[in-house]
C-alpha cells in the first residue's frame, strides 16, 4: 500500500539503491581532449559560437552545462569524433566511450550492442571456441575477461538478470540507460563521455550513478542538467552562444561563482549608468555656459559698433566652434551609451516571473482531490482512501514502473481505474512533456490563448509571457518551433491563463529534457503558484524547491 506523510522528510528514510559500486578496475589515465580554436558551422554556413572553443580536458570529472540549442550535443560529437570541426582541431589521446540517449533511441538488437561491446565480446567468444580470425585477435587483445566484466557491470547497475543477449526492446527506458552505463563501466576506454546519463533514471539509480562517478578513476566528461549529478564533478564548463566559460569546482561552486559574476556585472552596469548620468549633466552645464558666453559676445559686438565684416567673421567662428562642440558632445554621448550597452550585455536576465490568475488560488479547507477505494489498472498497488484540501503540494515518489504515471493519468481521467474512484473538485491541468508536445504545432501561443478564452487582454498577455522569457520572438512563432523548455512554459501559461484556470497541476517528470536554466525557471514559476500541486519527479532538488506539504511514497 502507498504511504503518505506530511512536512519534512522522515529521518533515516532513504530510497533503496542498486548494489555498491566498486572503483573502476581500469587504471587512472592521463587521457586528455584538446580543443584548439574549434568551430562548427551549420549547413547554411552560420558559426555555432561567436568565439571558437579552446579547452584542455584531463583527469577528473568535467561537467558541461548550457541551454538547449547552444550546441552541447554538437560538442559531444566533436569530442568523440562523430563530427569533424569546421575550423580548428580536436586532439584525442586515447579511446573515448560515449553514452548518449540518441544512441539508445535506435534500439540496438541486444544489450551487448547498447553497451558498445558487441564486436569485442563476439571476438572473445570466437577465440574461446577456437574460431578466431586475425581481426578477432586484435579485438580481443586485453579483453579476455570481458564476459566477466560485463556480468559484473550489469549486476552493479542493478540488472543481474540481464545478459548480453537480452533484447533491448524488452527493457524500460531506465533499464536501457543503466545498460549503457554498465557498458561504460565495463569498457576499457581511456575516457568516458556521458550525455544526459540520468535521463529516465529513478532516484535509486541516480544515487548509484552519482556514487559511481565519484569513484571512477578515469576522466569523465558529463553533459547534464541534473544538479545532484553535477555536484560530483571537479570542474564545470558552461557553453553558450559566445563560447565557453570555465568554472572551478562542482555545481555549488559554479552557482556561487555565477552569482558573484552577476553581482559584479550588476555593479558595473550601475557604475556605467552613473558615469553616463554624471557626464551628461556636465555636458548640459558646459553647453549652457557656452550659450551664455556666445550670447554675451553677440551683445558686446553690437554695442561696440564693429563692422559688418568683423561681425560676420565672429559669427562664422562661433558657428564653427558650435559645430565642433556638438560633434564632440555627440561622440561623448555615443561612447557613454556604448559603455552602458556593453555593461548591460554582461548582466544576466532577470529571473523568469509567473503570475497566476486569482481564480487559480485554492483557499485552505477547499477539497481538491478525493480517492475512494481506488484500484489502478495493470495490477498496481491499491489506494484505500485519501483526500487532499487546500493549496497542498504533494511529492509523489517511487521507483520506475511502480505506477506513478498511471495514478496521475487515472486522476486526470485519461485512464479508467480498475475499481473505486478518483474525484477532482477543482479545475486541473496535466503538465508534462506529452502535454507540452500536444500543443497545436501550427498555432502561435497568443492564438492558442485566445482559443482558450483567456480573460487577459493581448497587451497584458505579451507582458506576462515576456516575464516568462517568452518574448515577441517566441509568441509569434508556431508552437511547434519552440524548444522543449519553451513549450513547457507555454503549456503552463495555457493552464493558468485560460478562461477557466487550473487550480490543481498534475506534473509528471516535468523537468525531463529541460536544460538547467529552463528547469530553474519552471521551478521559480511553480514556487509562486497559489493552487495545489501533485508532482511526480526523480529530480530531488526540484521537488525540495517546491516545499512539499505531503510526501506520497508509492511502493514498487
Language-model-detected regions and their locations in the chain:
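Coupling and communication elements adjacent to P-loop NTPase active sites across diverse families
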Residues: 2-12, 27-41, 120-177, 257-378
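ABC transporter NBD signature
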Residues: 68, 172, 400, 483
Amino acid at each position: 500500500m502507498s504511504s503518505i506523510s506530511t512536512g519534512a522528510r522522515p529521518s533515516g528514510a532513504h530510497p533503496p539503491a542498486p548494489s555498491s559500486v566498486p572503483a573502476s578496475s581500469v587504471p587512472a589515465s592521463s587521457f586528455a581532449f584538446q580543443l584548439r580554436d574549434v568551430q562548427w558551422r551549420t549547413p547554411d554556413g552560420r558559426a555555432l559560437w561567436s568565439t571558437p572553443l579552446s579547452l584542455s580536458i584531463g583527469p577528473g570529472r568535467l561537467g558541461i552545462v548550457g541551454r538547449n540549442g547552444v550546441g552541447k550535443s554538437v560538442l559531444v560529437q566533436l569530442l568523440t569524433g562523430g563530427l569533424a570541426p569546421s575550423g580548428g582541431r580536436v586532439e584525442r589521446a586515447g579511446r573515448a566511450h560515449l553514452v548518449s540517449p540518441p544512441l539508445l533511441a535506435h534500439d540496438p538488437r541486444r544489450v551487448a550492442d547498447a553497451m558498445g561491446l558487441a564486436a569485442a565480446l563476439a571476438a572473445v567468444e570466437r577465440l574461446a571456441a577456437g574460431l578466431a580470425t586475425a581481426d578477432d585477435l586484435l579485438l580481443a587483445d586485453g579483453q579476455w575477461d570481458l564476459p566477466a566484466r560485463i556480468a559484473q557491470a550489469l549486476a552493479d547497475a542493478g540488472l543481474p538478470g540481464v545478459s548480453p543477449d537480452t533484447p533491448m526492446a524488452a527493457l524500460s527506458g531506465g533499464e536501457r540507460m543503466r545498460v549503457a552505463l554498465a557498458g561504460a563501466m565495463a569498457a576499457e576506454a581511456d575516457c568516458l563521455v556521458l550525455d544526459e546519463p540520468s535521463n529516465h533514471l529513478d532516484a535509486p539509480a541516480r544515487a548509484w550513478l552519482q556514487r559511481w562517478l565519484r569513484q571512477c578513476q578515469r576522466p569523465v566528461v558529463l553533459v547534464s542538467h541534473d544538479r545532484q549529478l553535477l555536484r560530483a564533478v571537479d570542474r564545470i564548463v558552461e557553453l553558450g552562444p559566445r563560447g565557453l566559460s570555465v568554472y572551478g569546482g562542482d555545481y555549488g561552486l559554479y552557482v556561487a561563482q555565477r552569482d558573484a559574476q552577476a553581482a559584479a556585472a550588476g555593479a558595473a552596469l550601475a557604475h556605467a549608468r552613473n558615469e553616463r548620468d554624471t557626464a551628461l549633466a556636465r555636458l548640459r552645464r558646459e553647453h549652457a555656459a557656452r550659450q551664455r558666453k556666445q550670447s554675451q559676445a553677440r551683445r558686446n559686438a553690437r554695442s561696440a559698433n564693429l563692422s559688418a565684416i568683423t561681425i560676420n567673421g565672429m559669427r562664422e567662428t562661433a558657428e564653427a566652434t558650435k559645430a565642433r562642440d556638438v560633434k564632440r558632445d555627440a561622440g561623448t554621448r555615443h561612447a557613454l551609451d556604448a559603455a552602458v550597452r556593453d555593461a548591460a550585455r554582461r548582466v544576466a536576465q532577470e529571473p523568469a516571473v509567473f503570475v497566476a490568475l486569482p481564480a487559480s488560488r485554492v483557499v485552505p479547507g477547499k477539497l481538491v482531490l478525493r480517492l475512494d477505494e481506488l484500484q489502478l489498472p495493470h495490477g498496481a498497488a491499491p489506494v484505500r482512501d485519501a483526500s487532499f484540501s487546500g493549496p497542498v503540494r504533494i511529492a509523489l515518489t517511487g521507483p520506475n514502473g511502480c505506477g506513478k504515471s498511471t495514478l496521475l493519468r487515472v486522476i486526470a481521467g485519461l485512464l479508467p481505474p480498475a475499481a473505486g474512484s478518483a474525484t477532482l473538485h477543482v479545475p486541473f491541468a496535466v503538465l508534462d512533456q506529452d502535454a507540452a508536445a500536444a500543443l497545436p504545432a501550427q498555432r502561435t501561443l497568443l492564438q492558442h490563448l485566445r482559443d482558450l478564452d483567456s480573460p487577459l487582454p493581448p497587451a497584458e498577455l505579451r507582458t506576462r509571457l515576456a516575464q516568462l522569457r517568452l518574448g515577441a520572438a517566441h509568441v509569434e512563432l508556431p508552437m511547434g518551433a519552440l524548444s522543449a523548455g519553451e513549450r513547457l512554459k507555454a503549456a503552463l501559461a495555457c493552464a493558468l491563463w485560460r478562461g477557466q484556470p487550473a487550480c490543481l497541476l498534475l506534473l509528471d517528470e516535468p523537468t525531463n529534457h529541460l536544460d538547467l536554466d529552463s528547469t530553474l525557471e519552471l521551478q521559480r514559476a511553480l514556487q509562486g503558484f497559489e493552487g495545489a500541486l501533485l508532482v511526480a519527479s526523480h529530480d530531488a532538488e526540484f521537488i525540495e524547491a517546491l516545499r512539499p506539504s505531503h510526501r506520497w511514497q508509492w511502493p514498487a
